[in-house]
Amino acid sequence: MKKTLLIYFILFALLPLWSQHKATLIHADANLYKVDSLLYRSEQLVAEDRAIIKNIPIKSIVNLRYFTRSGDKKIFNASDNIKLINHPLLTWRIKAPEIAQTLKIIREHQKQGAVLIHCYHGADRTGIMVAMYRIIYHNWTIEQAKKEMLNSPYGYHSVWKNLEALFTESTVKEVRKHLGMQ
């Protein structure tokens, strides 16, 4: 009986860790990671990345770049069967409504399969979107998502203090409201 209780206690204690898996590195040169079975993240892809992407079940690519938005069109064509979506964001102007709109786009396209989200470096705009995705859909705490964005090897640029300031209960509440989750 004591052994069974001990096992239950250990399993209960470890339960939160199972939903907090780290993203899996796919290709370091592209800052390409698998977040979960339906979400990947990267920097702006280059022609050499095409073969790697073709071996992953990605059905849509969401480009968050505001400037120079045509990079994906230079790499992928109609025969690749990958939907290319431009959703430009200015790093210094991201607020809860933009986060919610981006998450809606991701969720909508996940109905067809995995989505890759990227910006120029795959660190800042991509980082805040993946962090909020983790909070909203993986039930991560704000602190866990913030820690992943700031301290993981994605290359977050600390100049973007406005992104760090988005890690609040009020921002998450507003994102949920815009998503129709409250």
For each feature predicted by the language model, list its residue ranges:
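Positively charged n-region of N-terminal signal peptides that target proteins for export
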Residues: 1-4
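Hydrophobic h-region of N-terminal signal peptides that target proteins for export
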Residues: 10-19
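Cys-dependent protein tyrosine phosphatase-like superfamily
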Residues: 18-115, 128-182
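Short cysteine clusters
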Residues: 119
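Substrate/cofactor-recognition hotspot
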Residues: 122
